[in-house]
């Protein structure tokens, strides 16, 4: 049980760090983190479309982030590395954040989702799914799913091959959740299938 509690605690801490960095580094095209324990402390890799923004002028921002990770989140001797995201359109976290930003600017959720899917597919994705949930058009909360192409949904391919990202948009009607899943062009499936090109699909779904 002690080991289970440790992993739960570490998982919660990583989630809180991810949420904090998403807010602080939105302008950097924040795409997630990877935290690993090392003999010298804690290695933190920050994925971003604009690494220069994360580093800051003269390294000022990255030094401040290091202090916050150590003092506020309790990481032992954090060593931050910044890795550039070569194609932000294939990073689900980046796309979820950008979609949330579009909603906060007042772009209609359907228009924002269709534009995102078209851009993602143009950049070579094999498939993409976007779920937008909350009070989208009125008082009743609902969830709308948009998708195109092929996306592994279960098993090992869904866990290892699909890029997944989540973000929130703060609107007058309340919080809107945005979940993006992307199957990248280089995903190798155990049983290769032929995907018939279809237009973007849309459906209202019940919350699970």
Swiss-Prot record:
One of its GO terms (biological process) is translation. CDD domains: KH-II_30S_S3_arch. GO terms for molecular function: rRNA binding; structural constituent of ribosome. One of its GO terms (cellular component) is cytosolic small ribosomal subunit. Residues 17-86 form the KH type-2 domain. Gene3D superfamilies: 3.30.300.20, Ribosomal protein S3, C-terminal domain. The keyword RNA-binding applies. It comes from the Archaea. Keywords: Ribonucleoprotein, Ribosomal protein, RNA-binding, rRNA-binding. SMART domains: KH. The keyword rRNA-binding applies. Pfam families: KH_2, Ribosomal_S3_C. Binds the lower part of the 30S subunit head. Belongs to the universal ribosomal protein uS3 family. PANTHER family: 30S/40S RIBOSOMAL PROTEIN S3, SMALL RIBOSOMAL SUBUNIT PROTEIN US3. This is Small ribosomal subunit protein uS3. It comes from Thermococcus onnurineus (strain NA1).
